[in-house]
């Protein structure tokens, strides 16, 4: 028969009544990073423990001789050796800890509960940690049955109910002999074995052993039993114990635990991966019939991962040892004489508050009280530190501590104070000054405890609290207790900016703490009650109705209602779906902002997974409704895609892209599918299988809605991108209408923050145009008579066609959603000379916490372990006085003197709390911080008309300072403070080094001595790493931790710097052929000389004057700019060759002793002939002589000329196929005092297209596969056709060595990166000063073979694949054309074409057309500016009339004539350029708009007309469905009738003829359909009906009463359920426990403390996927 035998507290055979067992017990904890070094912070406790079994089988235990100790140092090599802790007697709490306690057994002799004195909880936990060693169940068999050697058991442990695995093996005889010898040396007395010496396995004892045992036994006996050693005759009743020795191993499986005891604040669902635990106990047990524990070693490990590098972690080790010293008869029973306090479970206890009592967090964990003395020291610390902080800016340039760290520790100090103490400090600082009070208010707000939050809410009348409290409640709040009070303050508060932010922030907080299925990660301490949990009903019955009421108030502005909508969205609960549904479907709201935000609130990242079916039912009709705006359909598709739907859904959407009427929707769907397919995610496996079904997407461009890895599930290390974005193209301009941006930051492993930015705009492009006009110098207007005539023609045209221009400019609206908070900017009003908002710079520190996570749980030894993850930052901009500003026409000056400081701190602190010690915790961790300090005087001047910016920077510090400082420090520490995060006494952090000193140390100057700035870069650490400038900049924005110590500082010393001020001058100079500083167009033999389609297409238009221009002023504040004069002289050499010359220059002046000046400029000019286009580029680097120093200037110039084929803006395919593609590059490098000497380097290159490539292109066009677009010609010239290149570089002996070394460096990089593809031939020598490169591309593979002939070698690179960014270089078209065609218009032609049978609009709509002699409006400006219109007619030849109302011009053009205001064009005009050929005229405007008249009419509109035009060419908004809209808003399906609606009379089209043609149009307009987008809820009213309700399911399972954490759908009575879904649902379960526990809970409730044990459990649940009306 098998029996369950519990050793010690498990069965009566284990401990014998009448006997006393004495053990030596020790417990130790050590923390460090052993992967770096053997350095540990450790603490230990050891004691003698006496255990007596009474006759009623209750057990009494008593500690004595208690000693404690600690250490913090590098250990010896053997990490398994005992810790060299120097122990000393325990001083505090020794009387309590040495009091005996009792363990009560139940009727089955199983331990039931423990009784002890009223004592701090940490002492009770230490007792439990000791008792739990003995709670070991073992399965044995009798002699008739085999032993079960391995088994598992679910047991209640100190950490929770866990699966323990046991292995028990009898020791072999030889090993048992050795163990017996060791045990006999240690035992002082053993009455069970002495009484039966004949049964000893070891027949004789050594003398030493006998003597030692006798002495120690006598000594111990005199203290306890007072009997001495007894003869066998006197021990007749002592049970015999066999010498059989058993080895028992117990391993705890933490993955199979339930009811885990822990305390979590702002934790993560990745906690189980971040923190890994293990526990292994090894037992030595003696006996068969009767047993006893001889020796126990319990070893625990806690591993905390610090970042994504799995090998970087902090380790904490716990160790318990128990060794039997003596077994003797009970001489004097240990009695319990106090009133006992029962402990009904064996789990770790935390200290719970009584009623409204406030207990600091560390006291909750440990039970060690925070005394009044400690509180007083904390308050003094806060007073002193806040006072010092308020004067911080006055002490620069002293080396300060990290600002974020100082404020962070002050926040933790306030977090340990109760309400009265906070009130006392508030009163104190209120009388000290505004700065001190402001700082303290920030501390209270960020403390986030219940007293702090209650105090902040009670003082919202104080403006300092009101303006900042609501902005930080999401991260700072540490407990759900104050949530009801915050909610009521918002509901009853007055509307305003801060109230709006509060609503949205609180909604996010309510989601995280009350409504989310993961809300236990916000706060969890395994209890239920109003102090520790947030009831969802609080939000559902109070906050949601408030938001719904305010949202439905149509009297509020859209932006106000949008705030309430966003708050509902932030709640992220299905209970809001029925509220949002009418908005989503467009029934109660038509505003696109409201609808898109409402739809996005249904994303998988924001809504419970059980809502999928209902969301699918709402959004799929929107996606399929072709009458919806494409933005609405896009966001509906995007929202459903976040739910990761199946293959069939993706297939349906992919196929729909071929026949969807909206190119914007189709393109967005395709790019989304492409982006997911190319990612390394699980969803990619599904989506990639239907990628081939999509209509090919246009390249990513601003005119096509595109998704570039938007979704959070596409964040992937393998994909290599943490910046993801998407956008919806605008129908009202070139700027996308909505932009989604996601930037991911990873703080630690499993803890990331995604910065979510959603921007929506209307009219922003128009606003930018207005700003550009204001930045342009006013120029001469046309003569009034011409203006009046043209204006009259414009008004007459509008009257004839029945078009009305808007009377006012459209509003510019910008909505910016930043991390679920909506900000709004409205109107043009800020353009009307609004003052600079100095008030936004308060001159006070700003503190923010991105992460503040605490995870705590017990260790086996009964003390708590906690992990703290912190990421915090602080910024302080202190402006000395008021900035000096001056503004005149087009010019502005600013002078400001300030100190700017910003800092970041990140650390992981793994802490074992040691409540018995004066060093309250041992800890190890990793710390990282970043600091930037800039004490500067900045002077800036902006000359908008001359396009010059001057910026001077002067450091104002007078002593050496660390401008930038980075630190990465792994450490161990014995903490001095309690609570540990309040640094009343500075801790002695001991860095963990690989050796005795850092392995790497370097100091060097950042700049050469000529610069005159003493800036030292000092680096030391255990890794050899010199970060790049990019790394330094990124570190300022995103710190990270490392287990390698590393420190770098950039130090500036003004006393050693000869340069005192650094000035920058930025210039842009544009010069026409005559030398005037304006954009000019040259009428050069009928060819384009500038402003061509290739160069200027897509640029913004400018308000220019007439043809007779004045030279623009180029002075800066009354003084002629020497830089601009120098640039003008530089441009003269290029102007003589014709063309438009532009220069961008940067000048740096180092003002000091001496003053030095450096200049860099880029100049380029472009000119064209009939067949070629020439681009000249000059790059100049100048080092001017220092002031007062006799030295020569030094100049480097690179002159290059690039010749490519030239193409007319409206070229034909035949023009492209017959063009000469030969392109050349010639470059010369000059070096010396000037650029007038002989070049030191000459480079010549040619690029060609082989006949094979041309043949392939022709075949592709004939087949219509690869070039199937409407305009194959532009596709061809913007494709990388060049397949051969030859480059020759020749240098002279004067070629400078430094440049030569750069070429060697580049050559080495190429050799290293292409080592597997490169071959060398060193057998022959070549020209000593020349390199020749010959490259050929394989047409089949697209790979290049590059042969390079060097002076002493020939290298051949095979199968070289060029990166995608290099492809534009190998296109026949100019680089600007290639980029604009690809990135702006997405390789989709946007020209409008009119011939004798049809019209193709700019958006691709084709309809029948019957030309006549009446004018038809091709394009007509619909903006408030009323720029004009383009008319077309056919009088035997095509004629175009351009009415440019704004400029007072009427341009008439035909294939043979070109007139301006009725007269032949003369001279030049900078506003346009004219091309004349035998059978055509082409006009190219500066804005990029082009019109060609030949045997057809072609119009190419500039981007500033996007969505702002109408006529027979459509509205140029990217959507062809709305192109056929007439001047009165009628929608036409008949092409000729549509064209007639835009007709107006003219020569050859008399009034009678005109009226006859317009008769059908007039009749149609009387009762015509208008084009409108029809929301789904309007066209399908039944879509509003919903059958679903949401409830929180409840159930009882055994001793648990559970409530689901997620609301589940149920059908209303009038509906039936379909397709039930069974899934695993997480519940919050209240544990009823044993009877004694229930009684204890009743007693607590009487005392005012309401809490019950609550743990998460998973159960399966079935719910309907959808509900259908009966």
From Swiss-Prot:
Gene Ontology process terms (BP): hemolymph coagulation
Top-level taxonomic group: Eukaryota
Alphabetized InterPro entries for the sequence: Lipid_transp_b-sht_shell, Lipovitellin_superhlx_dom, Vitellinogen_b-sht_N, Vitellogenin/Apolipophorin, Vitellogenin_N, VWF_type-D
Region (Disordered): 198-236
Alphabetically ordered keywords of this record: Disulfide bond, Glycoprotein, Hemolymph clotting, Secreted, Signal
UniProt entry tagged with the keyword Disulfide bond: yes
Region of interest (Vittelogenin), ranges: 15-674
Tissues in which the UniProt entry reports expression: Widely expressed with highest levels in gill and heart. Not expressed in hemocytes.
Assembly with partners or alone: Homodimer; disulfide-linked. Also exists as oligomers.
Name of the featured protein: Hemolymph clottable protein
